[in-house]
Amino acid sequence: MKILVIGNGGREHALAWKAVQSPLAETVFVAPGNAGTALEPALQNVAISATDVPALLEFARREKIDLTIVGPEAPLVIGIVDAFREAGLAIFGPTQAAAQLEGSKAFTKDFLARHQIPSAEYQNFTEVEPALAYLREKGAPIVIKADGLAAGKGVIVAMTLQEAEDAVQDMLAGNAFGDAGHRIVIEEFLDGEEASFIVMVDGEHVLPMATSQDHKRVGDGDTGPNTGGMGAYSPAPVVTDEIHQRVMDQVIWPTVRGMAAEGNVYTGFLYAGLMIDHTGQPKVIEFNCRFGDPETQPIMLRLQSDLVDLCLAACDGKLDQKTSQWDPRPALGVVLAAGGYPGDYTQGDQIHGLPLEEVADGKVFHAGTRLEEDLVLTNGGRVLCVTALGDDVAAAQKRAYELTKPISWQGSFCRRDIGYRAINRK
């Protein structure tokens, strides 16, 4: 079979790396891919942007692609799944209407309220004055979210009223997030521990993936601004068997059934970003309509099932006939980022010390990289995700940091404490 993976991040490198291990996969293309996918002997990059739907469609038709897996949110929100399905091509992902679960924070909050799915108290605003009045009524800490897509960075957790007012002004009166910020959601600050709960959905049936925990803040000890994610590990010990069942019953099933009831049948990866409080009650912070990045990297390292087989079953509405097998060992991924990220950073720096062959119990997944002649250069803020397995989270952490040691470029940095919550539970 011919498989097409759309995207150019670490998530897509991990999905393509896992897809090509399938006995069903004859060729795996990645559009546009990165240096990591270019250097994988079994993968082929295709120079088409992830959001150029007409060109992707033409390529899929010409190459007779049997299955397309969409990595990032942007093509989903502009309707790539609708376009491929109309052309009779198998594609795993939600339709444009269903992708509103990620594409609009306001849509999601209203949906959660309609279906009594636990979430933070909130209100939507498009005007500065009512938003400021609401802030003053509620006080800080409080959370301000840009309504549209902002690459995982459109959320401000304001610890003071001044920070909150500045965020509202920046988004609604200024242009901090462009069109994405012209409508905002203000919601209560939730206390607890976060977890990423990702499932595969075929419209009716659900197959849970392994749980994981992301590290959003740029600095050690969860300090500094939010990023797209500085590292992750799987599984997340905060999600006990009991909490897992609670999430399925209170969040996942009501979401899948609620979307279907409203005429937006959901297919694809569904990622619930959760806050779990001290009583074990989960609340939805956000939905993403795709796999998380960097959570995909440790999850794919642990997945022992055939990813292509699972995606095909989902496209056929037969996920109820499938189970997923996992390496019992935890996996942990550390993101190496460009100096200055998540603010301004340079690109085009040569990366030194990348492993020349496959490493035991680990994998260096590429994100913001490109190949120029034979040099691997930086091409984004989050550049690599160095991922490893271990007998416990501490061992996986030790192995991942060992693998990062030889790798460097001008200004590169990483958090030194990925996995600390799981390790501190011991």
Question: What do the PLM-derived regions correspond to, one by one?
Answer:
Residues M1-A97:
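ATP-binding N-terminal substructure of ATP-dependent carboxylate-amine bond-forming enzymes
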Residues N45-T51, Q123-E127, A158:
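Short acidic-hydrophobic, aromatic-tinged amphipathic segments that line or gate anion-handling sites
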Residues F92-G154:
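A conserved helix-loop-beta module that forms one wall/lid of the active-site cleft
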Residues G154, A158-T296:
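Internal nucleotide-binding/catalytic subdomain
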Residues M248-L270, N288-V359, E372:
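Active-site "cap" helix and flanking loop/linker of ATP-utilizing ligase/carboxylase catalytic domains
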Residues T369-E373, T378-K426:
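Generic C-terminus detector
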